[in-house]
Swiss-Prot record:
SUPFAM superfamilies: DNA repair protein MutS, domain I, DNA repair protein MutS, domain II, DNA repair protein MutS, domain III, P-loop containing nucleoside triphosphate hydrolases. This protein is involved in the repair of mismatches in DNA. It is possible that it carries out the mismatch recognition step. This protein has a weak ATPase activity. Keywords: ATP-binding, DNA damage, DNA repair, DNA-binding, Nucleotide-binding. GO terms for biological process: mismatch repair. This is DNA mismatch repair protein MutS. Belongs to the DNA mismatch repair MutS family. GO terms for cellular component: cytosol. It comes from Carboxydothermus hydrogenoformans (strain ATCC BAA-161 / DSM 6008 / Z-2901). InterPro entries: DNA_mismatch_repair_MutS, DNA_mismatch_repair_MutS-lik_N, DNA_mismatch_repair_MutS/MSH, DNA_mismatch_repair_MutS_C, DNA_mismatch_repair_MutS_clamp, DNA_mismatch_repair_MutS_core, DNA_mismatch_repair_MutS_N, DNA_mismatch_repair_MutS_sf. ATP binds at G600, P601, N602, M603, A604, G605, K606, S607.
């Protein structure tokens, strides 16, 4: 048995879009068949049925109503599927045989432009990767905003590129099937598309650059052209950027510092507390800038100048915020314009946004000569009054969403529209009068003239009045409680009314397309305006945060220094309240004070102190004021952190292995301009190993890297490194003791401590009283018996006495080239040395 003609048509189309779930239009539904139906039924939680298709068995089928398909499509996209929409492209009434169908739209996670499928405040990236001549290139696009960027790195710096991919968090990626560095794809949560080979079609390359960059660009553009043919109109020249031209921090640092989100909710993050943006464009800009702070002194100073003007001018700031509040997302609207998906309501959004641009331009006129950025914003705000006037005279103030539904063109814009509208309205008046006339003629007071899309106009008479129906009524449909009729006269006027309505809807759509084409000429102006608005909104958000939280303008310098007076952690301070937060000073350079070794109990504030230093640097380098009484920030090229210990057992990695991998990454990538934060290094292994590794890392940083470093530890023995290793300074967190009660003062001061207050912290954590009291008894017994480090055999070799000539295991340990070893080699070697050490006992 062969398939039915309709199913053959389906299978032919499905063959061309085998990587998509095919939504096949049948009447008022999109139907899915075979494996697509099984998947959609499972993912959308809809009923799986079957359909006769000319085979012995019914084929699996499920469907969704076409008018509510968006929600279902969005759900499938969020779960990593692609969807192809196959429409009926001819009127079924006029079709001879099988209705013609074809795919009119493809939706994929990384290429959607409709706001329904997008997060308003988040960019939606798609990337392509290529490798050639020792380089790996990345091409990245944001289709909904028209952004296109390209970067490349040496194959030896693959981890840097991996970090950039994590920063972008793409929802889709494209690579050739023979792409070797699959390590780069492991963190992509969306779809990864594998192409057999580079498309044969010629894609024009209008830029010079490495072959890897050109190949990545070709892969991306060829894929996008299949999804969205207007893609070349969306993008201009790609932006070439170097990852190392921004302050670098990897995914671990982003999570540790809670820059974009914390573990519980997004609001308790750095982004969450400083986001005072009024537009979607500004919100995306702020998020983007927080993940790529600047390294250019002048660019930072220009931002700080603009923020300072906004901080000091209340009237300017609040007027601009009010204007921004009434601006729509011009960036994404301009792309919908290019793609031809813009609707009448979108045009009204553009119209309503333009006067706000005029007000903004007028407001910043008096400050454009005081700031480079205000001058740039002013220059990039075209007024586009022609666009406003065209929309204002042509489109009604509250049009329907669909341009094909009619009711979008204003009266007086087009004479023919006015004529059709008059004919339709006169016809509708005739219907009202006809209903009145028929009630009088028949004596049926409940008689109604109604309309639906299936039967057109009809007369409805209840069962109780059927004996009064005249002979010229022709029965059309029998209902439970009524019957429907038509008359020759009603049919005649139906043709006139529906003819006028159809002609009117068609003409309105034609006029809408003409208006859209005219506005398309201003697409670049719209994009420029959107970019300027995003920058302005970003700067105002920084100014509002500065006022809200009492931030001050930092001094930015090229010197390798970090000096902070009464610095605060902005997120913690917001959580506990300004009055309850204890500010702290910090001074770091690369000479006398290059590594602060911080001791103190858990919960005393060591991690907060370290994190706030990094957050102050990030804020300063995006051009923001900072939470401190005074801050002098020497440009930092990388912030590298090891804070907290999170087991990665799912990947077969223990706490200690994760710790060593992260430390290895820091030591390999840090430079003298970096800021390093190391919290409790070595605690994932035995005391001997932990202290040895911690000291070796400190020595390496001080001798080889010379970076500004904050190093917290519970190994009090390490405090002896002050005076032995240049640049190491001891700092501790003040604690107040009163009997068995301990108060953490959260004040970081020069000095050291030899107490951990672990039992007290256990008490705070709610351990049973019996356990806590027993712990104090055992501690007292140890102390009474003299079981202290200074009275017994040392728990480690003294770090600071005259050292004997190394031999055996120690000599082997010293000779290890830790930086060149992989984490696995280091772990294996450590195990081997431990076995040898046990043998030497």
């Amino acid at each position: 048995m062969s398939f039915t003609p309709m199913m053959k048509q389906y299978l032919d189309i499905k063959k061309q879009y085998s990587d998509c779930l095919l939504f096949f239009r049948l009447g008022d539904f999109y139907e899915l068949f075979f494996e697509d139906a099984v998947i959609a039924s499972r993912e959308l939680e809809i009923v799986l049925t079957g359909r006769d298709a000319g085979q012995e068995e019914r084929v699996p089928m499920c469907g969704v109503p076409y008018h509510s398909a968006q929600g279902y499509i969005a759900k499938l996209l969020s779960r990593g599927y692609k969807v192809a929409i196959c429409e009926q492209v001819e009127d079924p009434k006029k079709a001879k045989g099988l209705v013609k169908r074809e795919v009119t739209k493809i939706y994929t996670p990384g290429t959607v432009t409709e706001e329904f499928f997008l997060q308003e405040k988040t960019n939606n990236y798609i990337i392509a990767l290529a490798e050639k001549d020792g380089l790996i290139a990345l091409a990245v696009a944001e289709v909904s905003t028209g952004y296109l960027g390209i970067t490349s790195v040496d194959e030896g710096k693959i981890e840097v590129l991996a970090s950039e991919i994590r920063r972008l968090a793409p929802t889709e990626a494209v690579v050739l099937k023979n792409f070797k560095n699959n390590f780069l794809l492991k963190d992509i949560t969306g779809i990864v598309n594998y192409l057999e080979k580079l498309p044969a079609e010629e894609i024009e390359i209008a830029f010079k650059g490495p072959e890897a960059s050109k190949e990545a660009y070709k892969i991306l553009i060829s894929y996008l052209k299949r999804i969205e043919p207007a893609v070349l109109s969306i993008f201009g020249q790609p932006e070439f950027y170097q990852i190392d031209s921004y302050l670098y921090f990897d995914e671990s640092t982003r999570k540790n510092l809670e820059i974009l989100r914390n573990r519980e909710d997004n609001s308790s993050s750095l982004l969450g507390i400083i986001d005072f943006t009024q537009t979607a464009m500004g919100a995306r800009k702020l998020k983007e800038e927080l993940t790529k702070p600047l390294l250019n002194l002048k660019a930072i100073a220009d931002r700080l100048d603009a923020v300072e003007i906004l901080v000091n001018d209340y009237e300017l700031r609040e007027n601009l915020r009010e204007n921004l509040k009434n601006l729509y997302d011009l960036e994404r609207l301009s792309i919908k314009l290019v793609c031809g998906t813009i609707n009448p309501k979108d045009l009204i959004k553009i119209k309503q946004s333009l006067p706000q641009i005029w007000h903004i331009k007028n407001s910043i006129n008096h400050v454009k000569n005081k700031s480079v950025l205000f001058a740039e914003i002013y220059k990039n705000l075209p007024e586009m009054r022609e666009v406003y006037n065209l929309i204002d005279k042509s489109i009604v103030d509250d049009p329907p969403v669909s341009p094909k539904d009619g009711g979008i063109i204003k009266n007086g814009y087009n004479p023919t529209v006015d004529e059709y509208r008059k004919a339709r309205e006169e016809g509708q008046d005739w219907i009202i009068n006809y209903e009145k006339k028929e009630r009088e003629r028949t004596g049926i007071k409940s008689l109604k003239v109604n309309y639906n899309k299936v039967f057109g106009y009809f007369i409805e008479v209840t069962k109780a009045n059927l004996h009064l129906v005249p002979a010229d009524y022709q029965r059309k449909q029998t209902m439970v409680n009524a019957e429907r009729f038509i008359t020759e006269e009603l049919k005649h006027y139906e043709n006139l009314i529906l003819g006028a309505s159809e002609k009117l809807a068609n003409l309105e759509y034609e006029l809408f397309c003409e208006i859209r084409s005219e506005i398309l000429k201003y697409q670049e102006d719209l994009k420029r305006a959107a970019s300027a608005v995003a920058l302005l909104d970003f700067l105002i958000s920084l100014a509002v945060a500065a006022i809200e939280y009492d931030f001050t303008r930092p001094v930015i310098t090229a010197e390798p220094v970090l000096e902070i007076k009464n610095g605060r952690h902005p997120v913690v301070e917001k959580s506990v309240g300004r009055a309850n937060f204890v500010p702290n000073d910090l001074y770091l350079d690369t000479k006398e004070n290059s590594l602060l070794l911080i001791t103190g109990p858990n919960m005393a504030g060591k991690s907060t102190y370290m994190r706030q230093a990094a957050l102050i640097v990030i804020l300063a380098q995006i051009g923001s004021f900072v939470p401190a009484e005074y801050a002098r920030v020497g440009l930092v090229d990388k912030i590298l952190t090891r804070i907290g210990a999170t087991d990665d057992l799912a990947k077969g990695q223990s706490t200690f292995m994760v710790e060593m991998i992260e430390c290895n990454n820091i030591l390999r990538n840090a430079t003298s301009r970096s800021l390093i934060l190391l919290d409790e290094v070595g605690r994932g292994t035995s005391t001997y190993d932990g202290i040895s590794i911690a000291e070796a890392i400190i020595e390496y940083i001080q001798k080889k890297i010379k970076a500004r470093t904050l190093f917290s530890t519970h190994y009090h023995e390490l405090t002896g490194l002050e005076g032995e290793i240049p640049g190491v300074k001891n700092f501790t967190v003040l604690v107040q003791e009163k009997g068995e009660e301990v108060k953490f003062l959260h004040k970081v001061v020069p000095g050291k401590t030899d107490k951990s207050y672990g039992i007290y912290v256990a008490k705070l954590a709610g351990l049973p009283r019996e356990v806590v009291e027993r712990a104090y008894e055992i501690l007292a017994r140890f102390e009474d018996k003299g079981l202290k480090v200074k009275d017994t055999v040392p728990v480690q070799l003294s770090l600071f006495e005259e050292k004997p000539e190394p031999s055996g295991v120690i000599k082997e340990l010293i000779e290890l080239d830790l930086i060149r070893m992989t984490p696995l080699e280091a772990l294996n070697k450590l195990y081997e040395l431990r076995q040898k050490a046990l043998g030497e006992k």
